[in-house]
Amino acid sequence: MAQASADVLIPLLWERLSPEHWPVRLTQLPEGTALVGGAIRDALLNQLSDQPDLDFIVPSNAIALAKSLSKQLGGTAVVLDAERDIARLVLNNWTIDLARQDGQTIEQDLLRRDYGVNAIALGLRPWGELWDPTGGLSDLRDGRLRAVSEGNLVDDPLRLLRGPRLISEHPLELEAKTQQWIALHRKRLGQAAPERILSELQRLVRGPQADAAIACLKTLDLLHGWAAGEP
């Protein structure tokens, strides 16, 4: 991805994301809604699927919004995290996650995410603002996978495994400092739920760069402690 300004990237994202084909209309979302995460990353890499998973940040009441949309549109709403106000809406084979903004601003929310390439947001209501407080656009351009911070990896140990999984799916290489952090905290992976670990591994082995990702797992010795049942 060549270096480009927001004036170029925003129309490009809009064209590739094609929100007019989403099962939820933008007018059904509250003011302050932004799209974040994998759909943004994949659109910028031109690897977007026909029905990408959509992750929306909303100012408040995400669970209530998911339930309301499910009643209006005939989908199914599932509460993922009541304390953090996160829900999932499954609708016409689309998966839409809605989460209350974590922090006072969208920038603060993005600074708490796992990797820079996942910490990019596009404003939907109002439309037209692109947030990239961690340098994720540069990471995508340079083919680099970089953790936002060491603390963010430890906050949810599954993020340690998510790095190699992202390598399996995208043309990215782990940045050196991020490799050090993952290796340092590798035994913490056992704190994640086994079903979440299994889901990441299943996606990893199906990725087009699975060989590179498996080599990364071996280099980092990431699964040894988990597979051996070490604390």
PLM region spans:
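Catalytic cores of the polymerase beta-like nucleotidyltransferase superfamily
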Residues: M1-P231
